[in-house]
C-alpha cells in the first residue's frame, strides 16, 4: 500500500511540474533537500514522508487524498484563503504572494485559460488602483471588526508599500495569462456606489476621499472600455468580456493549464474557497460556460450594448459628486 501510494505521488509530481522545469530541482527548493536525495525520492528508493507529501500538494496544487485514492466520491476538500482574521494586512499580503507565484507559473503556459463570473469588480482591474484597493480592505476590516482599532476611518488606514506593490504585481501576472474570460452583470459599479455612500454617511470616509475614489473608478472605466473595444489587454493577451443579462449571485472562477486545474468560489468579500478537485472544477467550469449563454460578448463586438453599458456605469459613478 505504501509503495503504491508513493508511486502515485511521484506520478502526480511529474504531472504537475511546469514545462521546462526539472522535478528534482523543484523538490530541492520545496523540501530543502540535496540533489541526490531528490532523485532517490523520484526513483522511489526513499519514500516521501507525510510532511513532504503535504508540502508538495500545497505548493503544486493537487489533492493528496485523490493521489493516494482515499478521496470519498461524495466529499470535496476546500482551502479557505483567510483562516486567521486577526492580522488581515499581513495575511492578505502573504496570499497575494502565493497567488502571484501561481499566476506567474500558469502564465508561462500558452494553453492557460482563466475564467471568472462575478457580481463585483475583479481584482485584475481595480488591483492597480491604490485607493480602490485601500477602500476594499478598509471595508473588509470594518465589516469583520478586525485589525488595528485605532484605524477608525478610511483616511487612517495606510497600506504597506510591499502590499501596494504586490497588488499591482498580481494584476500584471493575471493579465499575462494567454486567454481570459470575464462575465459580469450591471451591479458591479452600483455596489461601490452604495458602499461609498453608506460609509460617507457613517463618517467613516470624507467627501474628499470619495472624490478621489470616484476619479479612480472613472479611470478604471476608461481602461475597461479600451480593453473591451480591443478585446485584449495592453500586453496583447486576449480577453473575452461578457455582460450578463441576469444577476450573478456570487463569484466563481477557474484556471486550467496543460498541467493544472483549480477553482475558487468567492465569499466574505476578499475571502474564497479553493480546490484543485477535478469534479468541482468541471462543475464550476460548466456553470461559468452556462452563464455565458445568458450574456452578451462586448469585447471586440456588441458595440451598442458596450456603449450603453459604459455610459450607464459612468452615470452611476458620477452620482458620487
Language-model features: where?
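Generic detection of long, well-ordered alpha-helical segments
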Residues: 3, 17, 93, 207-214
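Charged, low-complexity, helix/coiled-coil-prone segments
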Residues: 1-5, 34-39, 112-115, 126-138, ...
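Exposed alpha-helical structural elements
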Residues: 8, 12, 26, 37, ...
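Hydrophobic protein-protein interaction segments
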Residues: 136-312
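Helix-turn-helix/homeodomain-like alpha-helical modules used for DNA recognition
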Residues: 73-149
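Basic, Lys/Arg-rich alpha-helical nucleic-acid-recognition elements, primarily the DNA-binding modules
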Residues: 1-79
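Short secondary-structure junctions and interdomain/linker hinges
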Residues: 16, 20, 103-106, 110, ...
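Long, charge-rich alpha-helical interaction segments
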Residues: 320-321
Amino acid at each position: 500500500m505504501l509503495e503504491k501510494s508513493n508511486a502515485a505521488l511521484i506520478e502526480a509530481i511529474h504531472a504537475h511540474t511546469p514545462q521546462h522545469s526539472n522535478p528534482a530541482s523543484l523538490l530541492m527548493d520545496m523540501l530543502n533537500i540535496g540533489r541526490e536525495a531528490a532523485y532517490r525520492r523520484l526513483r522511489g528508493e526513499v519514500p516521501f514522508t507525510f510532511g513532504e507529501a503535504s508540502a508538495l500538494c500545497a505548493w503544486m496544487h493537487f489533492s493528496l487524498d485523490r493521489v493516494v485514492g482515499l478521496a470519498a466520491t461524495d466529499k470535496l476538500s476546500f482551502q479557505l484563503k483567510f483562516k486567521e482574521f486577526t492580522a488581515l494586512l499581513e495575511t492578505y499580503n502573504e496570499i497575494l504572494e502565493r497567488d502571484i507565484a501561481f499566476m506567474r507559473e500558469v502564465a508561462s503556459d500558452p494553453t492557460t485559460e482563466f475564467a471568472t463570473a462575478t457580481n463585483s469588480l475583479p481584482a485584475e482591474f481595480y488591483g492597480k488602483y491604490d485607493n480602490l484597493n485601500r477602500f476594499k480592505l478598509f471595508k473588509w476590516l470594518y465589516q469583520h471588526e478586525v485589525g488595528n482599532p485605532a484605524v477608525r476611518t478610511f483616511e487612517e488606514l495606510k497600506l504597506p508599500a510591499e502590499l501596494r506593490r504586490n497588488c499591482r504585481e498580481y494584476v500584471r501576472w493575471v493579465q499575462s495569462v494567454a486567454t481570459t474570460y470575464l462575465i459580469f452583470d450591471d451591479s458591479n459599479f452600483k455596489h461601490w456606489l452604495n458602499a461609498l455612500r453608506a460609509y460617507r454617511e457613517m463618517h467613516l470616509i470624507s467627501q474628499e476621499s470619495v472624490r478621489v475614489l470616484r476619479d479612480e473608478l472613472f479611470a478604471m472605466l476608461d481602461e475597461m472600455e479600451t480593453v473591451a473595444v480591443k478585446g485584449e489587454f495592453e500586453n496583447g493577451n486576449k480577453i473575452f468580456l461578457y455582460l450578463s443579462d441576469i444577476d450573478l449571485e456570487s463569484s466563481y472562477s477557474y484556471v486550467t493549464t496543460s498541467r493544472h486545474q483549480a477553482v475558487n468560489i468567492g465569499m466574505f468579500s476578499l475571502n474564497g474557497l479553493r480546490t484543485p478537485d477535478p469534479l468541482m472544477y468541471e462543475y464550476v467550469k460548466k456553470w461559468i460556460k452556462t452563464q455565458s449563454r445568458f450574456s452578451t460578448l462586448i469585447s471586440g463586438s456588441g458595440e451598442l450594448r458596450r456603449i450603453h453599458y459604459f455610459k450607464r456605469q459612468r452615470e452611476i459613478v458620477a452620482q458620487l459628486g
